[in-house]
Amino acid sequence: MGKKAVHFGGGNIGRGFVGEFLHESGYEVVFVDVMDNVIDALNKHSSYTVTEISEEGEQQKVITNYRAINSKHNLDDVIKEISTADVVTCAVGPNILKFIAPPIAKGIDTRTLSKPLAVIACENAIGATDTLHGFIKENTDEARLPSLYSRAQFANSAIDRIVPTQDLGSGLNVKIEKFYEWVVEKTPFGDVGHPDIKDIHWVDNLEPYIERKLFTVNTGHATAAYYGYSAGKKTIHDALRDDRIRKEVNAALAETSRLIVEKHGISPEEQARYVSSIITRISNPHLEDIVQRVGRAPLRKLSRKERFIGPASQLAERGHTVTALMDAVEQALKFQNVPDDEESFELFKILKENSAADATTKLTGLEKEHPLYSRVLEKVDKVQKETK
């Protein structure tokens, strides 16, 4: 019997990153989604193409050996697939984890295989597998909880690969940058050993990798997007050609680098090289990376542990002054009423209907006692006054 992986999320990251890795590692991939058009297309076509983009050109890979199930209509089939799978992964967005947990919990509970299921969430969030794990426990009978870990093991991961805006009419095919990093903690797998997935970097301590990635790649990418949007730029490449915006992005990453170096013991030289490589990657003219796409979901990106408030709050707690990150927060607060982005409309509503103090806490989760609170409050108040 061959290896099988169940992957929740048939979107570009699911097909173009996680699906590619699983396919190249010899897994049959069962995609699970609620989007009828995605599931129908996956079941209609026996292959799709992943085009890897770099400054040297393009390389194509054909992905086969997959099936797809619509969890909206065929949840029992999803549960059955999980009960006999080797790996479950997901790329659905942190807010959707609570919805995929019940079928995963039921699939785990009905397992009879001797080897535990490996569960790895592939989200742009710190501790996403821990979050999913918590929801799975909530959906598991209390009497079965003591034996849960004989049936499943849960490992956090950090993923890094830019998926630009896709061409109209591309269908299942995905364009994606050639660079990738998928780091997964190996400790949870213990003596059983981690699953055999090609090109994953298995580590004992994930936190330095995930914070370095989130507070460099995601912070830099979003900073460029929000400044670019305010300046009327179309793509991240266009934004970073503007010296003023490039300077602001570098300033924000200088602040996050200070935290990464202090907290995780990464050398300043190594972090500087990492920052330089990130700026080069997100500046790639071959990635048609639209600022509205990168900036979308501002409520999530302004939240407590995310790419701006996460590092800024830790720096403030360490007694450091935070300036560039607060300027980036100001730009993010201006990302309002953007077409096809529900959160940007909600951001406008929150800023309009709440006091600066209430909006600050609602948006960032910061309490008044926190050393960063007053700095964020200033930015919220300023943007509120400018947009009245």
Curated annotation (Swiss-Prot):
InterPro entries per UniProt: 6-PGluconate_DH-like_C_sf (IPR008927), 6PGD_dom2 (IPR013328), Mannitol_1_phos_5_DH (IPR023028), Mannitol_DH (IPR000669), Mannitol_DH_C (IPR013118), Mannitol_DH_N (IPR013131), NAD(P)-bd_dom_sf (IPR036291)
Disulfide bonds: none
Residues annotated as catalytic: 213
Gene Ontology CC entries for this record: cytosol
Highest taxon listed in the record's lineage: Eukaryota
Catalytic reactions on record: D-mannitol 1-phosphate + NAD(+) = beta-D-fructose 6-phosphate + NADH + H(+)
GO biological process: mannitol catabolic process
GO terms of molecular function: mannitol-1-phosphate 5-dehydrogenase activity
Binding, NAD(+): 5-16
Subunit note: Monomer.
Family assignment from sequence similarity: Belongs to the mannitol dehydrogenase family.
Entry protein name: Mannitol-1-phosphate 5-dehydrogenase
Organism: Ajellomyces capsulatus (strain NAm1 / WU24) (Darling's disease fungus)
Organism phylogeny: Eukaryota, Fungi, Dikarya, Ascomycota, Pezizomycotina
